[in-house]
Curated annotation (Swiss-Prot):
Pfam families linked to this entry: TetR_C_32 (PF19344), TetR_N (PF00440)
DNA-binding region: 46-65
Domain of life: Bacteria
Residue span(s) of domain HTH tetR-type: 24-83
Protein name: Uncharacterized HTH-type transcriptional regulator Rv0472c
Parts of the chain that traverse the membrane: none
GO terms for biological process, alphabetical: regulation of DNA-templated transcription
GO annotation, cellular component aspect: extracellular region
Lineage per the UniProt record: Bacteria, Bacillati, Actinomycetota, Actinomycetes, Mycobacteriales
Chain segments annotated as coiled-coil in the UniProt record: none
Gene Ontology molecular function, alphabetical: DNA-binding transcription factor activity; transcription cis-regulatory region binding
Additional comment: Was identified as a high-confidence drug target.
Keyword Transcription listed: yes
Keywords of the record: DNA-binding, Transcription, Transcription regulation
Length: 234
């Protein structure tokens, strides 16, 4: 005979689930309000100022967030989940040729971050371990998606795919760090940054294709220094 679960237990579990869902939704509302407040007034807002902008007391904020570090981490996580990752999925799924796709992936990352300068700087000014983990997790997700795309395209071309993961991490990590440096000190336009990063990434990908993705072929090839053109000479 099957064991009957007491009705009171079922009701309690249902209440717990509803309360948990309410807390998640309310927390997301507060994070969204924080992001809007930072967009309007800049990254130096205090918890008191954030609470006032959202229209709640600071006590309410601390009911959902341990401290400002916790709120900062939640802002980064929300931005990653609702904006960055969806934008990167769309870019990686674009039906484009190699060069155009390479530039599109880089463009989407740079412009997604550049579109949120104050929230980005608000997050990056925080040095908590939890924030660093969120950033590392987002990079890992994007790198794995890039690796899947590279592997598929290389397999279709009959190339060796053994290096797709380190290549993907190199591209994602390099673009992220270069974009962060540019956001901190933008000494060129976003288009120039995108094209410089595309120049390096595309040149690297061309080298990989020339070796068929094969480490053995790459090792066997001669690697002379490139001949530097005499630019400007008639």
């Amino acid at each position: 005979m099957a064991e009957r679960i007491p009705a009171v237990t079922v009701k309690t579990d249902g209440r717990k689930r509803r309360w948990h869902q309410h807390k998640v939704e309310r927390r997301n509302e507060l994070v969204d309000g924080t992001i809007e407040a930072i967009r309007r007034h800049g990254r130096f807002l205090s918890m008191d100022e954030i609470a006032a902008e959202i229209g709640v007391s600071k006590t309410v904020l601390y009911r959902y967030f341990v401290d400002k570090n916790d709120l900062t981490t939640a802002v980064m996580m929300r931005f990653t989940q609702t904006t960055l990752i969806p934008n990167m999925i769309a870019a990686l799924s674009a039906d484009m040729d190699g060069f155009e796709l390479t530039r599109e992936i880089i463009r989407v990352y740079v412009e997604t971050v550049a579109a949120q300068p104050e929230p980005y700087r608000f997050v990056m000014a925080n040095s908590s371990a939890s924030k660093s983990k969120v950033i590392a997790d987002s990079e890992r997700i994007i790198a794995r998606m890039l690796a899947v795309m590279l592997r598929r395209r290389m397999q279709e071309a009959g190339m060796d795919t053994g290096g797709v993961e380190p290549w993907a991490y190199l591209i994602v990590g390099g673009v992220q760090l270069a974009t962060h440096s540019w956001m901190s000190d933008p000494r060129m336009s976003s288009d120039e940054l995108i094209d410089y990063l595309t120049m390096l990434s595309w040149s690297a990908l061309c080298g990989i294709v020339e070796a068929g993705g094969s480490l053995e072929k790459f090792r066997e090839q001669p690697h002379p220094s490139p001949i530097v053109p005499a630019w400007g000479q008639v």
